[in-house]
UniProtKB/Swiss-Prot annotation:
Compartmental location: Membrane
Binding residues annotated for heme, in chain numbering: C435
Membrane topology listed for this record: Single-pass membrane protein
GO CC annotation: membrane
Protein name: Cytochrome P450 monooxygenase polD
Recorded family membership: Belongs to the cytochrome P450 family.
Transmembrane stretches, start-end: 5-27
Entry annotated with the keyword Ubl conjugation: no
Gene name, Swiss-Prot/TrEMBL: polD
Disulphide bond pairs: none
Enzyme Commission number: 1.-.-.-
Native species: Polytolypa hystricis (strain UAMH7299)
Keyword field: Heme, Iron, Membrane, Metal-binding, Monooxygenase, Oxidoreductase, Transmembrane, Transmembrane helix
């Protein structure tokens, strides 16, 4: 009986919505009654990049689909994305109503929090933790862990994907809790992975029936099976983060802690009256988002460079001229390495680590290019199409770092530039939802990419296809396991890398020092 009422209600809503007169909506594939474009969304999940390029080619800059009775807008042109998601950010910066379940289960996380007081407070907190000056404090973690990674690559080049995963996780755990990760196989890390894998099912757009029929959230809790698993995941995740936060607070009390995101947040806790549970949510968001994106980018970098040896050779010539063979590249070298910077930008553009960005939602109706955009529309930036837009990029299907030579803007300045023709890529989002960790992320990418290109030759293995579409689906897309040949460029480079690892020191704790109750 309850299900019948739900279905009838959905039909009524769809008919009422579609019968609105005098409004022209963006074109899109024909929607089925009740189900909307469920079939198309399943195709998107199976072959995201191909489907998104097809959508952009067929429907142009705007495409309207339907999650059940809910309108979904896919934006496929850089100009429209700039106009709508940046310049009209007051309308396009919220999160979908379907996310209310996610926001309730995992509160105080920007990925789920709609616009409002909590969102504004979180933006303020993350800015205080991750701003350009604050991010400089954490370069010591990035420097140390990159040296560990280089030495690991010398000894176990075949495990490069695990090496960059460990690097990314250790940097962000060090920055959040002043605890580093020696080994991905640590039992606590295994627990984190088991939780994250299941959480992915909840955060992937379209993964829940709720995304298509949000009215199901009104059912009795006993009839919502997704709640039980979500509650369990929430409890397990909080237990882990509470232990790390407790370990950090003991260091603060003993005056043995140095500046990190966590110690800064402890000070903010007192000022803003933030509970430990909320502090854990804030730090959990940093770890989940920061580690996954950095690891995915660096794994993708290995594949891209193996496919483009000429670009690697140009970067190595630049590095040898600026840095020489007797030391590692540092951040001080960055202004003098335009080709290395161009490679970093072009990997972002040519091989984005997401197909669709995290969904936004409209808080009011809007009209763009004569098309009506209803209130509560779910809005996705079509990252695949944006990064291959022929109006923005010459020969967009080619990997050409040279296109960014002369572009001296950092990623933050580029993302905020008022001219859509200037922005380098779209990895870091839009408008009020622009990634708060952009300065920390770019510092990690620069120091690792510059040192990898300086010290190693990365080449395609004979018989390995290196298909760029061969990747794991998710909010962030990682390459599936693949093989490349990684060798030090010469004994002189290897000697420097081993010497730097031998003298590199850190005095922060390890995962073994975290105790659970």
């Amino acid at each position: 009986m309850q299900l019948t009422v739900v279905l009838v209600g959905i039909v009524v809503l769809v008919l009422a919505y579609l019968s609105s007169t005098g409004k022209v909506y963006p074109h899109g594939p024909q929607a089925l009654p009740i189900l909307g474009n469920l079939v198309q969304f399943r195709s998107l999940q199976a072959r995201p990049d191909q489907e998104l390029l097809r959508i952009a080619k067929k429907y142009g800059q705007l495409c309207m689909l339907w999650f059940g009775s809910n309108p979904v807008l896919i934006i496929s042109s850089p100009k429209a994305a700039k106009d709508m998601m940046d310049q009209r950010g007051a309308i396009y910066s919220s999160r979908p109503a379907q996310n209310s379940f996610r926001a309730t289960q995992w509160p105080w996380r920007l990925v789920t929090t709609p616009t409002g007081e909590t969102f504004r407070l979180l933006r303020k907190i993350y800015h205080n933790l991750l701003g350009p000056q604050q991010s400089l404090h954490f370069r010591r973690y990035q420097d140390f862990e990159s040296k560990v990674m280089l030495a690991d690559l010398l000894d176990r080049p075949e495990a490069f994907q695990l090496g960059v995963e460990r690097f990314a996780l250790s940097v962000i755990f060090s920055a959040c809790y002043q605890v580093r990760l020696d080994d991905l196989a640590h039992p606590t890390m295994t627990l984190f992975y088991s939780i994250w894998e299941q959480m992915l099912k909840y955060f992937q757009p379209g993964s829940l029936l709720l995304d298509f029929f949000p009215i199901l959230q009104r059912l009795p809790k006993s009839m919502q099976p997704w709640l039980k698993l979500a509650n369990s995941l929430r409890a397990r995740e909080l237990r882990l983060h509470r232990a790390f936060l407790s370990t950090l607070k003991k260091q603060v009390q003993n005056s043995t802690a140095v500046a990190c995101f966590g110690t800064m947040l402890v000070k903010i806790q007192e000022k803003e009256n933030i509970s430990d549970e909320r502090a854990c949510d804030i730090l959990a968001m940093l770890i989940g988002a920061g580690a996954d994106t950095t690891s995915s980018y660096l794994q993708t970098f290995f594949k891209v460079i193996a496919l483009h040896p000429n670009a690697a050779l140009k970067a190595q010539k630049e590095l040898d001229r600026v840095v020489g063979q007797d030391r590692l590249p540092t951040w001080d070298d960055e202004p003098n390495l335009p080709y290395v910077r161009a490679i970093i930008k072009e990997v972002h553009r040519w091989a984005p680590i997401g197909s669709l960005g995290i969904p936004h939602a409209t808080t009011d109706s809007d009209v763009y290019d004569g098309k009506h955009i209803p209130r509560n529309t779910i809005v996705f930036p079509n990252l695949t199409a944006l990064c291959r837009d022929a109006e923005r990029y010459h020969n967009p299907d080619l990997f050409l770092p040279e296109r960014f030579l002369g572009d001296d803007l950092d990623a933050y300045s580029s993302a905020l530039h008022p001219d859509w023709r200037v922005r380098d890529h779209f990895h870091y989002g839009f408008g009020r939802r622009l990634c708060q960790g952009i300065f920390v992320a770019e510092a990690s990418l620069y120091i690792v990419v510059s040192r990898l290109l300086w010290g190693f030759d990365i080449a395609k293995e004979e018989g390995e296809s290196l298909d760029m579409d061969d990747k794991l689906a998710g909010l962030v897309t990682k390459p599936k396991p693949f093989r490349v040949t990684i060798k030090s460029r010469a004994p002189s480079y290897e000697r420097v890398m081993r010497q730097e690892r031998a003298i590199a020191k850190t005095d922060i704790l390890s995962f073994n020092d975290v105790h659970f109750v």
